[in-house]
Amino acid sequence: MSNMDIDGINTGTIDKTPEEIISGTSGATRPIIRPATLAPPSNKRTRNPSPERATTSSEADVGRKTQKKQTPTEIKKSVYNMVVKLGEFYNQMMVKAGLNDDMERNLIQNAHAVERILLAATDDKKTEFQKKKNARDVKEGKEEIDHNKTGGTFYKMVRDDKTIYFSPIRITFLKEEVKTMYKTTMGSDGFSGLNHIMIGHSQMNDVCFQRSKALKRVGLDPSLISTFAGSTLPRRSGATGVAIKGGGTLVAEAIRFIGRAMADRGLLRDIKAKTAYEKILLNLKNKCSAPQQKALVDQVIGSRNPGIADIEDLTLLARSMVVVRPSVASKVVLPISIYAKIPQLGFNVEEYSMVGYEAMALYNMATPVSILRMGDDAKDKSQLFFMSCFGAAYEDLRVLSALTGTEFKPRSALKCKGFHVPAKEQVEGMGAALMSIKLQFWAPMTRSGGNEVGGDGGSGQISCSPVFAVERPIALSKQAVRRMLSMNIEGRDADVKGNLLKMMNDSMAKKTNGNAFIGKKMFQISDKNKTNPVEIPIKQTIPNFFFGRDTAEDYDDLDY
């Protein structure tokens, strides 16, 4: 399934009445189809970028033909063209797979299968690696895997009297055929479309899985989860991927690099490795919003032989990002199966913003269906889907509840698993359900972290990373942050560390009832032109943090 940045720009029209757009409000009960038996980017511009290093940096880069700066209208038209073409590609792949029923095409798992096949087919670097590995395996007498093919598990609809259920089927495609079909449909190499899909998968992983193991491996507290957005993004997502990565994700990349450099002192003498390391640190510096944070990164950049001291500095930096949030872009990314429905939905705007009204209206019009795994609750699954589409894993649950009119639950209270169905769970006669949670109100997405004002917090996740630009208090567990502030600041950069700790303490001493995004309001989903601003109601009985107590599957344990 799948998941740019022009805040506040909402031009264009949608040929849908307000009533049609609102038709699936959150509170409505949707039918469940029951089964018979439920069983490091590059900053350099290259003339011919490869699929491994797509260098689009934001919504402004989508469909760019020349270096001339595009107007907001041109950007939105090129984005609209991209999502429509992605939908066309999906339809072609489904025809090739022999899955033509509407229910099959609405299935989120089928959209994911097509997306994964496309990413595998266009990953020339991985294909080359598989080719070399095959050559070695043949020499060693092992079974050869055809590196020219890729495949996925699709779900075919089966009708049994009055019951509808789904059965898994494995379908393979030639990589070259998939690549040719994609490039022909997109009219170009379509790097922006690939990046869009990668971001969607990353946002889904952020919602469905915890990353405690990955955090612990680099010495970071699992409570820093809200800074770990985009941690499963592949490097080939380029600058677009860096924009949506959290500060903690980049800190972890830098710490891993330092760990390798400590084990192999010759590593940073290699010009490619040194350049990659410097890029990670420069990206991290650009993420930082406070001068004290940037100064700490400069200390690490200036270190000739990075080691333990630099890891300590970066750990402190990650902790400070809980209080003074870095710049993280937010985008609405929908499964390409929804983009395939744009012509049928009467969505004739010919302009589309992934951070504004159009994406949210399209989300409300769509009727996506998901396979239900054993024990899944349909409404809980709908919450996972909503949060995946909007990249809202670390958003305040009270804000999401206000926008949808549905009380959102923390991950530990949800009775459902992720959208990927492991091989051992793929059986005949699987049930499915419509994803029923819809927006009653909308607000533009944000790429800023709000401000450093604190509030009450929990015991697992200890801060929020805002996605919607609406005025509200920012949830932060001050007690947990204060525990992290008690650390030794002696050493080569005591002044820099001291300044950063002082900034954090000053921030923590502020009143807890201050708000972020002052003056920003939400709007009814029918109010495209933002004529009637509505104050967001914050319901105190709903917890702030989705990962307050981490009970989700760990991404590292995922069995593909």
From Swiss-Prot:
Any GO MF annotation of the entry: structural molecule activity
Protein name: Nucleoprotein
Organism expressing this protein natively: Influenza B virus (strain B/Singapore/222/1979)
Coiled-coil region: none
Pfam families per UniProt: Flu_NP
Keywords: Capsid protein, Helical capsid protein, Host nucleus, Host-virus interaction, Ribonucleoprotein, RNA-binding, Viral nucleoprotein, Viral penetration into host nucleus, Virion, Virus entry into host cell
Region of interest: Disordered: 1-73
Subunit details: Homomultimerizes to form the nucleocapsid. May bind host exportin-1/XPO1. Binds to viral genomic RNA. Protein-RNA contacts are mediated by a combination of electrostatic interactions between positively charged residues and the phosphate backbone and planar interactions between aromatic side chains and bases.
